[in-house]
Amino acid sequence: MSSAGDWRASLDALPVPVYTTDADGAVTYWNRACVEFAGREPELGQDRWCVTWQLYTTSGEPLPHSECPMAEAIRTRSEVRDKVAIAVRPDGSRRAFTPYPTPLFGKDGAFVGAVNLLIDVSEEQAEALAEQASRCRRLRQATTDPQAAQILDEMAKGYAENAAALRQSRPVFKAA
């Protein structure tokens, strides 16, 4: 593949979300699978680091786009691996995913941007959250401390709700 058009056609044909950014993190390209995954069309040159509407950690904390794995890869100019995040679409549905942000360098070795591939891991994440809820319920049954019991009940409820929310969103892509 010798031209940018060849590369673009190849990325467009992929059934998984892929997008690129420039060296400052502005989104410069995305394939159709990205739009389906994110539930929105990114704004060229406006969106930075991510194609998603909102992000959360797996523990339910908001994850600012400026702190997402792609932003980290751009800041450090190195691959970021072994992360999972939760994408929230404009319709409120959620997808858990593993990103694979990878820096891009020109022929002269200068950093030019990054590419990111997103793998939907919602079902696996929902199973892990359901197991955490079950673990909290078992611990709750074993404790005699009322305060600990209340905390464990709340934790179990949160894990179960997050698992249910991931399962209610129809998967777009399955991990290989």
Model-derived regions: residue spans:
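Sensory modules in modular signal-transduction proteins
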Residues: 1-23
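Sensor-regulatory modules in signal-transduction proteins
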Residues: 104-106
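Terminal output helix/cap of sensory domains in signal transduction proteins
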Residues: 42-91
